[in-house]
Amino acid sequence: MTHQGRCYCGAVRYEISSAPVFNAQCHCRECQYISGGSPNVCLGIPEQGFRYTAGKPKTYRRTDLDNPVSREFCGGCGTHLLTRAPAAPGIVILKRGTLDDPAAFGNPQLAIFTCDQQPFHHIPEGVMSFERAPGKP
């Protein structure tokens, strides 16, 4: 089964054809900056199961960090579409709100970087929570 998504203005479109390897909320400060304050609700999709079908996103990578992530976004409307992280090679971290059907994959299965969680962030009942990423000190 395939799922489609796009940026807000529709200039950049994509398709996913692989099942997610994770379904999460990320509460790290970096994601809060990108989202405007909310946790990042995301899916980890194998790279081979993701492709852009229209448009070409712009990429941003902070130069002042060691091993920074790459963030891909629409140059027209600014919608953040996905992240590529050195710590997760072969995976694109897709922003669920950009899917045509954001509810297609149900509730997140885990919440990560809860050490940065804000008092107004909500983690659904029963979701596994980690102060950092699973397996990281």
Regions found by a protein language model. Name each.
Residues 1-137:
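A short Gly-Trp-Pro
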